[in-house]
Amino acid sequence: LFLFLEKKIFIMMPNKMIESTEILIIGAGPAGSVAAALLRQQGREVVVLEREQFPRFSIGESLLPQSMEYLEQAGMLRAVVEAGFQFKNGAAFMCDGQYTEFDFRDKHSDGWGTTYQVQRATFDHILAKEAQRFGAQIRFRHEVTSVDIEPEKPVVTVKDPEGNVYQIQANFILDASGFGRILPRLLKLESPSNFPVRGAIFTHIEDRINCSSFDRNKIRATVHPQHGDVWFWTIPFAQGRCSLGVVAETSFLERYKGSDLERLQRIVSEDESLHTLLKHAQWDTPARHIIGYSANVSSLSGKGYALLGNAGEFLDPIFSSGVTIAFKSANLAAALLERQFAGEQVDWQTEYGQPLKRGVDTFRAFVESWYTGGFRRIIFHQGHQPEIRRMIAAILAGYAWDLTNPMVKETARRLTALEALCI
């Protein structure tokens, strides 16, 4: 028995009512909002369940130029441009007094060469409102507590802000829950990451940087002077603020006692260049931390569902790849769902999982090389041909799926070969 209320379909079951929708998205972050917008433009019915109330804080604040293409395709670019975020055109690296930078406009791949550095509370809220503008229904403070994928159409159990529990059935579920990793946790899809357990301590500050050589249009990664696998991010925002964080294995971070802000300040003081750069900073925001952020899953899709962005796999903050991977996954999934709803057979493993992982694996090779020191030796080496740097710049700009770039093919082997030349 079906009951129609306010254009919504409800399935009458014994002693309960199950709501029905075409697409259910878990999480209203970048992946969820972009997927919702794309699917609404296809005419699909979309419900988004978001555990938190927006705006809310998140890290992952330095976008990559490749992201602009996905925002444009989703019809969200204008809203982002008009928000007045900090312009970004590249990335800079510092290690042992050495400095190098990449201008993303000078890259191998075609496409956007500039983007923005964003406060995620504002950025994510903009994307969510854009998804709503396209007609997606977003329910904030609605938490998924269980999922059943055994029925023909999966059923999700949800708790609303008042503590009431209800169920919703969907033709397909997209998990865009980010670090919450709802489906991997509930369906036991999680698998160990190949990376050591690392953590990050971070905050926002009024930076008061008056150094003329500091380029606010670039994210900067600074390597700790005594510990090569420890590094700091400095992400300038508009209005004289920046995001500051340190990334290290948990054993290193545990050496420092006190509040997160005190720990971060002590570690920053160990790098003379960064300490000097921020000597006038106003530390006006409590620091936060995240531990064990790297994650993997046994599969990116299954019966009636697919995992988007960080819900599937998160590598590391070093190359700011998270939001770009989130957008790429949303773009791929929305295109496949359009075909699936048109009656085509879709092989999610070969048409979603494999293409997505191609770029993820390119970023993975870069991350691994960063922590072994190989990537640092490559980028500070002066003898490379300009085209080599353009190939690297393209991947740093997010074009990790561009097969015209030799660095995307056999990335780890090519990085090893380049490192061998840095003598």
Give the residues covered by each predicted segment.
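C-terminal helical "tail/cap" subdomain of flavin- and related membrane-associated enzymes
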Residues: 335-423
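Predominantly flavin-linked oxidoreductase catalytic cores and closely associated redox partners
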Residues: 130-274
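N-terminal Rossmann-fold NAD(P) dinucleotide-binding loop
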Residues: 32-33
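Beta1/beta-strand and adjacent pyrophosphate-binding region of the FAD-binding site
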Residues: 17-29
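N-terminal FAD cofactor-binding segment of flavoenzymes
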Residues: 58-96
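FAD/FMN-dependent oxidoreductases across multiple families
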Residues: 252-336, 342, 346-353
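Glycine-rich FAD pyrophosphate-binding loop
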Residues: 40-59
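Short beta-strand to alpha-helix junction loop
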Residues: 108-129, 254-259
